[in-house]
Amino acid sequence: MIKSIPIERILFLDIETVPQAGNWNEISGEEKNLWDKKTLRQRGEDVSAADFYQDRAGIMAEFGKIICISVGMLEKDNRLKIKSFYGDNEKKLLEDFGNIFNSPRLQNIILCAHNGKEFDFPWIARRMLINGFQPPVPFQTFGKKPWEISHLDTMELWKFGDWKSFISLELMAHIFGVPTPKDDIDGSMVAEIYYQEKDLQRIVEYCEKDVLTLANVFRKMRQEDLLTKSE
């Protein structure tokens, strides 16, 4: 029962990712060749490797980078304290993020994200390795039994064993009556906003709002009241 999980131990998390380069012509010939090979089956022969790069490189850890990680934890006043790590320097971002796990409060932390088991958690671990860091203990799953891995995933919790099911965080928020801001941005627009509009702060705000939405969806699944963000 998820209601028995101590919510004060949960680190709610969301990441925003983009392709490593703003356009196809900025990557090396070797990387173009590797991208072509890796994605041929997914895109088919009708879609060029260049077009597919613009659309999909930001969701593959080998060809993308993290530009924002937002995390939230419950405070004693029942507000969610949110902190973001962001910037153009991914290595510095990941180093700063990794350092929070040195805190005594985070020694027995439980990670929670929407589709986190297939996206956020492995993405962070892979990008840390690529940048020369060992992922913090909560991200290391090798050799652990399934019940020893402290990961929560609201998408997985909603499946109830129906592994064909996919549901967006936005839809979960809607069905549970969780208020969400009517932003003019969604995940598919992040790369354009980052590379063309150069508005990273707008992306950070979007990421933080998703963390609050995530926490409130989780609360609703436990039949608990909504949280507000701590200022």
PLM-predicted stretches and their roles:
Residues 1-99, 103:
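Conserved RNase H-like, two-metal-ion catalytic cores of nucleic-acid enzymes
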Residues 4-8, 64-88, 104-205, 209-231:
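Metal-dependent phosphoesterase core characteristic of DEDDh/y 3'-5' exonuclease domains
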